[in-house]
Regions:
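Amphipathic, charged alpha-helical segments and their helix-to-coil junctions
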Residues: 139-159, 163-166, 170-241
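Hydrophobic helical h-region of N-terminal Sec-dependent signal peptides
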Residues: 6-10
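Residue-level signature of catalytic and energy-coupling elements of molecular machines
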Residues: 59, 129, 223
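N-terminal Sec/ER secretory leader and immediately downstream segment
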Residues: 26-105
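Positively charged n-region of N-terminal signal peptides that target proteins for export
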Residues: 1-4
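Bacterial signal peptide processing site
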Residues: 19-22
């Protein structure tokens, strides 16, 4: 009889303990890491990703227009150091117009290729694990953009490079630069073999990141740019820091 009573008592204790554990668990915020002001780390992460995604959409839309790179002082693709001596040589012999066309077409290729960048960047954003959402939210104006760039640049380069290669041929940049390099090598007796595909890919990706950083900074500093409830809730937290 004592064993039965003891067993019933133990069962009651275990059931009571389970109920208490469930109550405690229900009070723990969802997501990993410490949140801020009642907003979970997971929700902060979602807000940061949404801001980055909006930055990509806005940046790609602007850069993908004619002169989106070429006449934007922040993102214009300039010649790499290796080709600056080629540019000077052409101008010295009266072929400045050919040099101008070569530079312009590098930017035209970026403008054409970047129209296909949005899904590539979006995939990188959505699959990115934000380990310190709180720290990023309370960081500098471009903290989320810098985090994305540091963790996805190689992935983005691999996915975006074929698009740039296609665009270089599409806009005629390959043809013009073959003429330029052939002319330069013939005149100087030197051999210059630039990897324009890799260079334009790198510069185009940098250009998108600059636009994303600008958008992130705007969302952080301008309440009017927080156009969704999630952005308002998450970035409202950094206003109180």
């Amino acid at each position: 009889m004592k064993k039965i009573i003891l067993l019933l008592g133990l069962t009651g204790f275990l059931l009571s303990s389970c109920e208490e554990m469930q109550q405690i668990a229900s009070q723990i915020p969802t997501g990993t890491g410490e949140g801020i002001g009642g907003v979970s780390s997971m929700k902060i992460s979602e807000g940061l990703k949404q801001a980055l995604e909006f930055g990509v959409q806005d940046g790609v839309a602007k850069l993908g227009k004619k002169d989106g790179f070429f006449k934007n002082s922040m993102t214009k693709i300039l010649l790499p150091e290796e080709l600056q001596k080629v540019d000077r040589t052409l101008r010295n012999i009266g072929l400045g117009s050919l040099a101008d066309e070569g530079l312009k077409l590098l930017n035209r290729a970026a403008e054409d290729a970047v129209t296909e960048a949005a899904p590539i960047f979006k995939n990188a954003i959505m699959t990115m694990s934000i380990n310190d959402a709180k720290g990023i939210l309370l960081g500098g104006n471009n903290a989320a953009t810098n985090y994305l760039e540091n963790r996805t640049s190689n992935q983005l380069f691999t996915a975006f490079e074929p698009k740039v290669k296609n665009s270089l041929g599409k806009v005629g940049a390959d043809e013009i630069w073959n003429q330029i390099i052939t002319k330069y090598n013939s005149l100087t007796g030197q051999t210059v073999t630039p990897d324009l595909n890799a260079y334009v890919t790198q510069q185009a990706i940098k250009g998108v990141f600059k636009m994303v950083a600008e958008k992130e900074s705007g969302i952080r500093s301008n309440i009017g740019l927080r156009t969704t409830p999630l952005l308002q809730e998450v970035f409202g937290l950094q206003d109180k820091k």
